[in-house]
UniProtKB/Swiss-Prot annotation:
Belongs to the universal ribosomal protein uS17 family. GO terms for cellular component: cytosolic small ribosomal subunit. Gene3D superfamilies: Nucleic acid-binding proteins. The lineage of its organism: Bacteria, Pseudomonadati, Pseudomonadota, Gammaproteobacteria, Enterobacterales. One of the primary rRNA binding proteins, it binds specifically to the 5'-end of 16S ribosomal RNA. GO terms for molecular function: rRNA binding; structural constituent of ribosome. The gene is rpsQ. PANTHER family: 40S RIBOSOMAL PROTEIN S11 FAMILY MEMBER (PTHR10744), SMALL RIBOSOMAL SUBUNIT PROTEIN US17M (PTHR10744:SF1). Part of the 30S ribosomal subunit. The keyword Ribonucleoprotein applies. This is Small ribosomal subunit protein uS17. Keywords: Ribonucleoprotein, Ribosomal protein, RNA-binding, rRNA-binding.
C-alpha cells in the first residue's frame, strides 16, 4: 500500500493572517443532468511558515497533519509570483 501525499495547485486569495494563507482551488465539473461544464472553487487554509506569499500568487500545496481547526495543508513552493 502506498501513501501518496495529495498535492494541489491554486491561487492565493488572502494573506492577512500571520503564517497562514487562503488558497482557491478551481476545478471543472460536469453538471449531472444538463452536461454543461461548471467551474467550482474550493478554499483551503494553508500554513505559510515564512510569510512568503502574496495575493495573486500561484502556489503548490500538499496535505499534512492538522495544524489547527481549519489548517491541514502546507506550502511547498511558489510557482508564479503575482504581477503588480
Amino acid at each position: 500500500m502506498t501513501d501518496k501525499i495529495r498535492t494541489l495547485q491554486g491561487r492565493v486569495v488572502s494573506d492577512k493572517m500571520e503564517k497562514s494563507i487562503v488558497v482557491a482551488i478551481e476545478r471543472i465539473v460536469k453538471h449531472p443532468i444538463y452536461g454543461k461544464f461548471i467551474k467550482r472553487t474550493t478554499k483551503l487554509h494553508v500554513h505559510d511558515e515564512n510569510n512568503e506569499c502574496g495575493i495573486g500568487d500561484v502556489v503548490e500545496i500538499h496535505e499534512c497533519r492538522p495544524l489547527s481547526k481549519t489548517k491541514s495543508w502546507t506550502l511547498v513552493r511558489v510557482v508564479e509570483k503575482a504581477v503588480l
